[in-house]
């Protein structure tokens, strides 16, 4: 089924409101295996809407119109659709009864002929009751094309779609998706590595999305059951993860989790809980952001001992007992400082892990290091590891955010190696 969404309303074209309905409808239709090929917006104008309906009827098998079902003169969607199809408008008894009750309970409200338009449907249409408003929707098929009219307000449209429309459109297959999350590899490199899979995809499909500091891959397939979908998605996932970078590193090393809501932090927190291990932090440029991120999750008192925010050289020396002369000698942005910060954070809190972050968030360079230079230390029983990352060309906020992601990834790898 090839679907098309037409949003009716001059306020959309003038930018007064954002057309969130199209995004919602496309997402929900995809979930039941209906592909949306076109999204269009048109003003409250009968001639232009008639022209658009003529085009849509030739290229789409499902045409969904949103908006223009209200009680004002410029609400003309149903009237225009009826004219296009050569049909009359008739009253829906259930919607009429709801309208009668509405005004009976509000004797001070003026009932006008325009109010009656809200409870009309195109002749032959299946009414779609409005749970939260008065304007009834409708669905009808003419000459192989299914037409649907829905109210514009999202508070009315969403329940109508979820409870009335989707059950009537259900096909034998649904769209199932799986999201793979990658850290430590850029979108351009990932897309280049997967070029053959992307260029030759049919079903299942994969689509990359760049996010701040990471990349996700959405794998999608149409299937009649979750089990059938898993079989197809498992094959594609293994094909992806079996690929290697130009340096010969498996993509499995960069894939850290699944799902829209998963994050490096959530993975690390859950793994620390599972292994019964604790962590402490000493932060400079991130100023407690790592610790605040840990504290966003419930139940972290069992794994998070506490930490230190040591922004200046003096505080690094005072709070972490690192000799000031050593800090001055090596610099606060250095492998030495990251190492000592991590070790002292671990020692002072008696934690299993001590993580540290020191670097240059910007906008100015520091100690000869360009903006985005970050040293991250991880202290544990096996010793202390320090990595240097360069997060150039980013805002100050992004440098700090991505630095924290690198810190969580360093802890994640250590936990997996245990």
From Swiss-Prot:
InterPro entries noted in UniProt: CinA, CinA-like_C, CinA_C, CinA_KH, Competence-induced_CinA, MoaB/Mog-like_dom_sf, MoaB/Mog_dom
Q: Which domain of life is it from?
A: Bacteria
Pfam families (UniProt xref): CinA, CinA_KH, MoCF_biosynth
Q: Which SMART domains match?
A: MoCF_biosynth
Q: Which family does it belong to?
A: Belongs to the CinA family.
Q: HAMAP family attached here?
A: CinA_B
User: Could you identify this protein by its name?
Assistant: Putative competence-damage inducible protein
Naturally occurring in which organism (per UniProt): Streptococcus pneumoniae serotype 2 (strain D39 / NCTC 7466)
């Amino acid at each position: 089924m090839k679907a098309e969404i037409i949003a009716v309303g001059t306020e959309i074209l003038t930018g007064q409101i954002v057309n969130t309905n199209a995004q919602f409808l496309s997402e929900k239709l995809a979930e039941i295996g209906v592909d949306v090929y076109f999204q269009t917006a048109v003003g409250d104008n009968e001639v232009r809407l008639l022209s658009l309906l003529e085009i849509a009827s030739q290229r789409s098998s499902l045409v969904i119109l949103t908006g223009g079902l209200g009680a004002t003169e410029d609400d003309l969607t149903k009237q225009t659709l009826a004219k296009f199809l050569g049909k009359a408008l008739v009253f829906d008894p259930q919607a009429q009864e709801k309208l009668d009750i509405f005004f009976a309970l509000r004797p001070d409200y003026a009932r006008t002929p325009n109010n009656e338009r809200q409870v009309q449907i195109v002749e032959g249409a299946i009414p779609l009751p409005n749970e939260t408003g008065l304007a009834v929707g409708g669905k009808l098929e003419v000459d192989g094309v299914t037409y649907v009219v829905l109210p514009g307000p999202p508070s009315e449209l969403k329940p109508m779609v979820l409870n009335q429309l989707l059950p009537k459109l259900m096909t034998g297959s649904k769209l199932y998706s799986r999201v793979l999350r990658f850290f430590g590899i850029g979108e351009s490199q990932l897309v280049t590595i997967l070029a053959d899979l992307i260029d030759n995809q049919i079903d299942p499909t994969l689509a990359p999305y760049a996010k701040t500091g990471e990349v996700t891959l959405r794998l999608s397939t149409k299937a009649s059951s979750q089990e059938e979908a898993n079989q197809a998605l498992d094959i594609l996932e293994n094909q992806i993860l079996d690929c290697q970078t130009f340096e010969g590193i498996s993509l499995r090393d960069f894939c850290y989790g699944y799902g829209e809501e998963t994050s490096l932090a959530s993975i690390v927190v859950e793994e620390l809980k599972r292994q019964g291990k604790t962590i402490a932090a000493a932060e400079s440029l991130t100023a407690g952001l790592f610790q605040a991120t840990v504290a966003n999750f419930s139940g972290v008192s069992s794994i998070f001992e506490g930490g230190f925010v040591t922004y200046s050289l003096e505080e690094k020396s005072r709070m972490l007992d690192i000799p000031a002369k050593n800090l001055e000698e090596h610099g606060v942005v250095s492998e030495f400082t990251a190492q000592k910060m991590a070790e002292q954070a671990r020692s002072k809190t008696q934690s299993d892990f001590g993580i540290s972050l020191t670097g240059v968030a910007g906008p100015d360079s520091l100690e000869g290091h360009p903006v985005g230079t970050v040293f991250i230390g991880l202290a544990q029983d096996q010793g202390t590891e320090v990595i240097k990352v360069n997060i150039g060309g980013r805002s100050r906020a992004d440098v700090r955010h991505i630095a924290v992601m690198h810190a969580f990834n360093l802890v994640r790898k250590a936990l997996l190696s245990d």
